[in-house]
């Protein structure tokens, strides 16, 4: 309450739904620097996240978007960022596709800004990909040992953490796990 929110969406079809929630919608692309700059100009804080719309290499796409985020922040002069990252962002290329978050964090961390990296664990919703084996075998099949414990998070819990990071800023660079 009391904050103006602008959201960059790639879909004109979502504008009415976004604005019904109380945000101002701007149609554009996170892969277009001009769209990012126009959306972020005048903002006190930016919430940035990588979407799943990569074509080709997720890591190459993420690096490109991370560089665009960095350029947009430099251009607009924003001094406070909350970035949705991922568990594993502190790891190297051996982590696989999650390495993209290491790259993005590195790019953003190089800026002289206050930034909070929000690192959620696995999403509950991703379990839907295992629904067939859950129904047929009463099991979730993964490529790690059965003794491995996995933590899951619900998007609403991530949202609460992001809102808290926006409303209660901390100076410097911080990491919050969800």
Where are these regions (language model features)?
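Oxidoreductase cofactor-interface core, primarily capturing Rossmann-like NAD(P)-dependent enzymes
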Residues: 1-17, 31-34, 41-43, 51-61, ...
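N-terminal glycine-/serine-/threonine-rich beta1-alpha1-beta2 phosphate-ribose binding loop
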Residues: 21
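Cofactor-binding loops of NAD(P)H-dependent oxidoreductases
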Residues: 28
């Amino acid at each position: 309450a009391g904050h103006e929110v602008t959201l960059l969406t790639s879909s004109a079809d979502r504008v009415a739904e976004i604005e019904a929630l109380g945000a101002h919608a701007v149609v554009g692309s996170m892969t277009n620097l001009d769209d990012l700059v126009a959306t972020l100009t005048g903002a006190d804080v930016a919430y940035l996240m990588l979407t799943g719309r990569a074509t080709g290499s997720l890591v190459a796409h993420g690096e490109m978007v991370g560089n665009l985020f960095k350029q947009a922040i430099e251009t607009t002069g924003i001094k406070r960022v909350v970035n949705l990252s991922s568990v594993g962002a502190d790891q190297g290329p051996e982590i696989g596709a999650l390495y993209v978050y290491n790259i993005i964090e590195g790019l953003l961390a190089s800026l002289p800004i206050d930034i909070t990296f929000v690192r959620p664990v696995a999403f509950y919703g991703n379990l839907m990909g295992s629904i067939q084996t859950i129904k047929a075998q009463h099991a979730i099949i993964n490529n790690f040992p059965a003794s491995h414990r996995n933590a899951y998070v619900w998007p609403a819990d991530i949202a609460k953490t992001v809102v808290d990071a926006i409303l209660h800023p901390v100076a410097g660079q911080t990491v919050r796990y969800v």
